[in-house]
Each structure stands twice: as C-alpha cells, then as structure tokens.
Amino acid sequence: MCSIGEDDFGDEGGTHAMVAGSVPSGIDLSPGECSKCDISSDELFQLNFRTPECRDCFLAYVRHKFRAALGAAKVLPRDAEVLLVVDGSAESLVLLDMLYYAQTQNTFKRLHCSARMVYLEDQPVQGRDPADLESLEALSKRYEAFEFYVITLGLPVGSLKLLKDYSPVAQESNELIQKLSQLRSLTSRQDYLQQQRKNLIASVAQKLHCSHVFNSSISVDLATQLLTSIALGRGGSAALDVALLDDRLAAGIKLLRPLKDLTEQEVQFYVHAQRLQPLLMASSRYGQELGDAASLQNLTSAFVANLQKNFSSTVSTVFRTGGKISESTHPEQAKCNHCQSALDVELSDTLLAIEYSRSVSEAGVRLNEAIEDPEIISKRRMKLNDELCHACSSIEADFKNGS
C-alpha cells in the first residue's frame, strides 16, 4: 500500500503570492546532478526535507501524490464522469495539468475516467473584471482533450456555456451580489458565498451528468478550513470539510480533493516546472483585502499562515488531526437545508445562550417593554431554525437584521 510521508509539509512558500516569471526559492538554475537518477540537469528542485532532484524526478514524485490519494482509498470508480473545477488559481491549474497527464498515459498507467472542465468565474462577485477570454482560450487549447465550460458564480445553472459560446455578463444581473450586500458581517458573506459556490458546482455536475467533482484544495487550505469550520459552529461536520471524499453535495454527487497532500512549495515548483500561467496572480478570496481582522475566515487564514511561517510543521499537524476526526452521524439524521451538514437537534445550552444574547441585543431599549421573556423568545427562534445548522442560522439571522 502506498504511503505519503508526513515530513514534507514544512513549506514557507506562498502559492497565492507568486509573481509571474519569478523562480521559487529552492530551485537551483545552475547545472547539477540529480540525487535520484544521477543524471546531470540544468535545474534542480529541492523541496524541504528532500534532496535536490531533476525536473522529471520531481514531477514523478508530486504526481504520485495525486495518484496515491485517489488510488489508496479507491474513491474514484473506473470510467467515472468527473467535473474538474478551475478558478484560475495556481492550485486549480496544477490539478488540471495532473489530470491531463494521467489521462494521456498508456493503458496501464492511465487514469480511467471521463473528465470535463468548468471555469467558475467569481471575479464579478468581488467587483473585479472577469478573466481575459484570450487566457481562457489558451488554456482550453493546451488541454483540448477536455470539454471547456464556463459559468459565472451567482447566475443560474442554465447560464452554463461552452467557452466558444461564452461572453461576460453584466454585474447588475447577478442576484448573488445583491444578496451579499444584505449581509452585515463579512464573516456571513464569506460563508454564504462558499455555500453558494458548492451548490452551483453540484448543479453544474448534475447538468453535465458527472458523478464526481475534483476540488483543488491543498494542505494549507484544508488546515485553514478545519479551524474555520470549528470557529463558525460547524464542528460536527468539520471532518468532511477536510476529507478526501465529501458526499454532502446534492443528487449524490461526490466531491474529491486529490491535492490534499500537496504543499504550497510543491505547487510553486510544479507551476515553474510545467510553465503554467495562473490567471490569478494574487490571493483573490472575497473580502481578503479588508484585512485579517475583518472576518473569522480572514483571521483564521492569517493565524495559520503565521504559524506556518514560524513553525513549519503546523499545517501538517492541523491537517493530519483533521483527517483523524470522524463524523458522528447516522443515515436517518436530518441535514441542514443550506449546507447539507448533519443537524444536531438537541437543545444546547451554549446555542441557547448565544440566541439569548442575540435577542437581548436586538431588543435594545425596548427590552423593558417586552412582554415575553428573552429566554422564551430565544427557544422559539431556535425551533424555527431547526432545519438549519448553527452556522447557517447565523447567516439567516444576519439576512433579517441587514434587510
């Protein structure tokens, strides 16, 4: 059985901060001898905790991680229909290139699946210009074996088009932008946006008759997501947020994270080795430009990045811990209508205290005039939201308060 070492997570790179044409730290452009195959090479790749190796040996090593993630658990059936989600980030292009390579091998080594690619355009939601069509066309030409679809986040699944038929849509017609403006806190907006993104991906996969979706999250993304889920009140489903297989999508569609064991440094090296051109040169997550303290998500991301910079094994520790968490659910347990996470229907003193505090805050100066006790109001509100998990209930409350 193939295993992946846990000592290769010590990276201090910043995939999202890569500059086009720059050489990542750890790549030696001077000629040298590969420690793996003993062949002289014009450039050597030295990952943390590994000896210098040539381009071919490095690519074989990192591609093996991709294949091992899928093969060890046997989560991808033979001849499965796969939807690959590309957002222009370095990670998504690495996943695209790895899948393309795996599908162009000989019969013995080939990854037997039928893949389609969808570019999820989310820049208009952030008030930015959409991706350059010429860049998308160049990407489609390089990986012409895949059908290339495009859809804009916030638009109905009916707007899904092949790249050759796609044209950018005006922001005024995007209902998601209007809904985000109704939420008061950036924490709620980022969380709501993430759930809408997952729902749209599931709808696209269903329309294209794909049973599996490939997501490009790497180890640092999943470590951040684990802590964020716990902070938002989704601890009960945090295991699925970082697992290789997430089966919460609609219509039985399964989300796979085959790059979960890759580090930022490995992504940087792969981009350089394959001469990939990410469409997003800097981190473009919604609301990140507002600062680390603007939301729980931003704060958690900055916290993980700071720990990773000063203690290089932090991401590995957090990520591996998340992999050992199991979801305590049973098949008959109800699901949240929004995020599809399992619902904990038991009345929690902690949640009651949160709702009580919220009721008191909303009552304000009218509290002395209220006929009902705030505790009664809190319990009634919790029962009204019994089809939503705590995190999604917070989003719903933010919608009502913001409107």
UniProtKB/Swiss-Prot annotation:
Compartments where found: Cytoplasm
Keywords linked to the UniProt accession: Cytoplasm, tRNA processing
Pathway(s) it belongs to: tRNA modification; 5-methoxycarbonylmethyl-2-thiouridine-tRNA biosynthesis
Signal peptide: none
Domain of life: Eukaryota
Keyword Transcription regulation applies: no
GO biological process: one example: protein urmylation
Gene Ontology cellular component list: cytosol
Main subcellular location of this protein, as a coarse class: cytoplasm
Molecular function per GO: nucleotidyltransferase activity; sulfurtransferase activity; tRNA binding
InterPro entries: CTU2, Rossmann-like_a/b/a_fold
Pfam families membership: CTU2 (PF10288)
Family matches, as PANTHER family: CYTOPLASMIC TRNA 2-THIOLATION PROTEIN 2
Job of this protein: Plays a central role in 2-thiolation of mcm(5)S(2)U at tRNA wobble positions of tRNA(Lys), tRNA(Glu) and tRNA(Gln). May act by forming a heterodimer with NCS6/CTU1 that ligates sulfur from thiocarboxylated URM1 onto the uridine of tRNAs at wobble position.
HAMAP family: CTU2
Family named by the database record: Belongs to the CTU2/NCS2 family.
Protein name as catalogued: Cytoplasmic tRNA 2-thiolation protein 2
